[in-house]
Each structure stands twice: as structure tokens, then as C-alpha cells.
Amino acid sequence: MTDHPRRVTRALLSVSDKTGLIEFAKALAAHDVELVSTGGTAKAIAAAGLKVKDVSELTGFPEMMDGRVKTLHPKVHGGLLAIRDNKDHADAMKAHGIAPIDLLVVNLYPFEATVDKGAGFEDCIENIDIGGPAMIRAAAKNHDDVAVVVEAEDYKAVLDELAANKGATTLKLRRRLAAKAYARTAAYDAAISNWFNRQLEIDAPDFRAFGGKLIQSLRYGENPHQTAAFYATPDKRPGVSTARQLQGKELSYNNINDTDAAYECIGEFDAKRTAACVIVKHANPCGVAEGSDLVSAYRKALACDSTSAFGGIIAMNRALDADTAREITKIFTEVIIAPDASEEAIAIIGARKNLRLLLAGSLPDPRAPGLTAKTVAGGLLVQSRDNAVVDDMTFKVVTKRAPTDAEMRDLKFAFRVAKHVKSNTIIYAKDLATVGIGAGQMSRVDSARIAARKAQDAAVELKLAEPLTKGSVVASDAFFPFADGMLACIEAGATAVVQPGGSMRDDEVIKAADEHGIAMVFTGTRHFRH
């Protein structure tokens, strides 16, 4: 590939986001570039004292239909699409009075922002850009001759090339800008089509598109031999993608994945009702607790599995305070994420330069609709987010003994947590804290036994005479297919169980519970997580 420089003699600018526009236009004018523009962009350039030609002067045709038709004209698209070295194209341009356009600067109508503001259907429709994407695609197709800019962040790259190449752009830059241009129009169309699907309540459209904006190129993926990048999607759900990083090292792929898991889990706990803390390792909670304040919630969560918590991710549902910050800095932690933090807490965390502190502003709404996606070989699995919430469920008592008030409180707590642990999941909980977590086992019995062993290890570390599972309650993310899994929980000391129910052998499981005098409730809601 040669540099193939193309001198910029004429630029068409039409932008909704006018950030940096005037400085850019002035720099183009300094390179003797003729400025052509539309509507508000032309007015802004003219108001800055620059000479600018309205696009209607170029086309000989006025803007019409409330601005819906202004650049959809052969003299615009011919100027963008004409191959400069093609004699037939050159002859056609001369015959029809078409002037070449060497640089196109367009950012699109703010459709995504309009949707985010909760605008009505007609307002959203009016913010669907037609002429902009058409011009962008035309210019990008003809990138051998035309440079196309879709974001203000690329103004500098264009100006640097004009300065270095006597007013010309290189093919290398034009190709990079063309690739970005097509990605932008694809993401824009994805946002529109997904919005339409939501309006029409279409869950499985014939074609599904997803768009994202690069947040960060990552050093590597899950493992050092894998490449990775992090993209923001249009829904702006509070979490790691929207949070401000106040300090610490650059987030890694695994940091982002784990932080997302932690913050989604903490979103289950209403900050107005209780303080809560979640500690995550490898995308699984290893300690979760509620408390009268954050520091007590953190201590209870840490006590569940302090070994796994080393190098973990900590999520809080309230603003991080100084007392909690001091406790956290006593062990190695990768990331802290919270809605906010006090100045004193920020200063305390600041003494640990590598510790990443993220402030998300608010908590994710566990009831909010949305989609999750997972790639498979040659395909994409898409499903609605698991937005079933404990507070909306009916806990049906199916045993002779009903749970006590304290047991029911802990059962609801444990089932909140079970939703966010990899299946098969068994959670032992007591006094609004996890005391044993069994995650990701192929056998539910194994999950029950592993969680009980972890609780026993924690009791030894805390120098307790009895296992933490004694007098605890149990949550299972899915039904017990046989009584053996529940019996393992009873053997560990559990006194009450919450599970979805729905097994062919529910009667057998209920009978075993009654024989051992424990209480059991069904939710009717399963929380598989893979």
C-alpha cells in the first residue's frame, strides 16, 4: 500500500456535536480548504468569521421538508463517490457541474441520546439521521480519494496529516477513518433497530445487531495469549462501563468481568433499607453480607471466605466511608466499586496506588429489562436479563414446619445471592451473611458439601467451637432432583431451605424435610447461571 496522498481542497461539514468544530474549521481554512456546510453547522462557522458555502449553493437546490432533504443530491454524492483517476467519472463531473469533496465531516443526529432522555416515539423518529449515514457510507466507500470523519476526536489526526503532507491525507489514514465510519453507521443502525424492536415488543427479530463504543483496548484477555477490548453499549446500565476510575492500575479483562459480577449482585440490596457488601473472585461471590453499616457488612462478608477474598473485587451499595476503607486496605484487593465515596475514604484508598477505585454514581436496577448475549460456535445466544427479584416472589411453605421470621429473613437474603453464583449453587447463610458458598459444581450434592467444608474452614479460622452452618439456612438456585442434596445440607446443620421447586421428586424431597423437622419454601423461580 502506497501513501497515495490526496490533497484536500473542499470539505463538507455537517455536525450535531459541535465540539472542536470552529478550531477545526479555522485550521482547514488555513490550508486553503473551501468549507461547505449545512444548517446550524454553517451558521456556527459563519458566526466565527469564516467563509462558508451553504450546501444549497453547491446543489442549487434548497433544504426542504423541515431539513429532511438537504444533502441527498447528486452534486453531493457525486462529489463524494467520483473516482478521481477514472476518466469517465471525471467527464461526468465536468458535464454535470459536480465539484469533488475531499473531506467529509459528519456526526449523526443524536438518536441514542434522544432515546436515553425518554423522548416520545415521534421525537425519536425525527432524530433518525438519513442524509448523514448516506454521505458517510459514500465517502468511506471512496476512501481512495476521500477522508471521512465521524468523531471530533479524529480532528487532530487529520490536521496533523495536512500539516505533514502539504495539505494532503494519506491512504493509511483514510482507510482507518473509513473502517471507523462503517462501524459508526452500523452501531447507529443497531441502536435504531433495537429501539424499534423494544417499541414493538419483538423479542426475536429476524436480524439482531449490537453496537458498542470502544472504552478501552485491554492488554490481553482472560489469558495473556488472548487479545481483548472493552466496549460500552447504548443502554448505559450503571456499573463498570459507566463508572469513573479515580485511581489504580488500568483495569484488566478479568477485573472488568469480576467487577461487573460484583456490582450486579450488590444491586439486589436496596441501599435505603440496608448496608451491604459483596466480595467476588473469578466472577463468583465468595462473601456477601448485610449490616447496620458498611464496615460491619464488609467484615461479615470477609469472614465467609477470607482466603478467596484475597485479590478479590469488593462492591458496596452505599458510599464508601473511611472506616470501611481502612478495613479494606488491610488485605490485598484488586478493585473497589461503589456508588460514591467520602473524601476521607478516597484519601485512605489513595495510599494504595495500585488499588482501583471505581465510582458508579448509582446502583443497577435488578428489575430493569435488558438483554444478555453469549457467543457459541457460529452463533449468538441472546436472552432477556434475569430480572426476577426476591421482593416480587411468593415464598410458598411446602413443609409441615414454617420458617421462623429470622429464618425467612435469611432465606430471602440467601436466594438473592444464589441468583449471582454459578450453577450448581448452594448458599448457606445466617444472620444476613453467607457462611458457605458452593459454586459451579456439576453435582448439587458436591456444591452442598463444598460450601459446608468452606464454612467449617471459616469457623476454624475464627476459632469457633461449632461450624458456621449449624442453625443456618440454605438457598439452592434450582430444584433438588433428589433428596440427597438437601440431606447433605441438613447434615451440615441447616434448619430451613429455599429452592424453586418443580422436580418430579418434589414430594420425596418434602417428605425428607418433614422427617428431619426442617422448613422448606418454594419460589417457583429458577436462577441458573452459566
From Swiss-Prot:
Catalytically driven reaction(s): (6R)-10-formyltetrahydrofolate + 5-amino-1-(5-phospho-beta-D-ribosyl)imidazole-4-carboxamide = 5-formamido-1-(5-phospho-D-ribosyl)imidazole-4-carboxamide + (6S)-5,6,7,8-tetrahydrofolate; IMP + H2O = 5-formamido-1-(5-phospho-D-ribosyl)imidazole-4-carboxamide
Keywords associated with the record: Hydrolase, Multifunctional enzyme, Purine biosynthesis, Transferase
Residue ranges of every copy of the MGS-like domain listed in the record: 2-150
GO biological process: 'de novo' IMP biosynthetic process
One MF annotation (Gene Ontology) recorded for this entry: phosphoribosylaminoimidazolecarboxamide formyltransferase activity
Listed GO CC annotations: cytosol
Pathway: Purine metabolism; IMP biosynthesis via de novo pathway; 5-formamido-1-(5-phospho-D-ribosyl)imidazole-4-carboxamide from 5-amino-1-(5-phospho-D-ribosyl)imidazole-4-carboxamide (10-formyl THF route): step 1/1; Purine metabolism; IMP biosynthesis via de novo pathway; IMP from 5-formamido-1-(5-phospho-D-ribosyl)imidazole-4-carboxamide: step 1/1
EC number: 2.1.2.3, 3.5.4.10
Free-text comment on this protein's domains from its UniProt entry: The IMP cyclohydrolase activity resides in the N-terminal region.
Family the entry assigns: Belongs to the PurH family.
Name of protein: Bifunctional purine biosynthesis protein PurH
Protein's organism: Bradyrhizobium diazoefficiens (strain JCM 10833 / BCRC 13528 / IAM 13628 / NBRC 14792 / USDA 110)
Source taxonomy: Bacteria, Pseudomonadati, Pseudomonadota, Alphaproteobacteria, Hyphomicrobiales
